[in-house]
């Protein structure tokens, strides 16, 4: 999980803490992009959004390309853990990101969890499809739970994704920011 090291860079730590603080103060999502130029990873400025979306532009400095993104969830249904929503997964796939990070504030701690496209996204997309019963059974997940969640709203579906916590723990890295 080579992308985990990016969370330990001083400028990324500072921007992550800023995004966590601003999200907590305003109850709006905040985030930023990770860009790659000349073999270096840089973090863009922190952008603010709405209560349940950030709407970040896919922008980097001239000569750099977007390789990832980080944003902070504020909704109560996501506050138990930093778990990606189906929209987060879809966006990372469509925009061909190498990794993406989700954060949330819980008990005066900022939790940020990053996921790489190679070790999570393709598997998660398949898991969320009804026709992958064999893979679901291997993970000990009941197909009825998936059917129910697919037929309901995204918010309920995200709630059902907590079933995948063990799976997510094996396919992500996590950092705690005290604030």
Where are these regions (language model features)?
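Short HxH-centered metal-ligating active-site micro-motif
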Residues: 40-98, 105
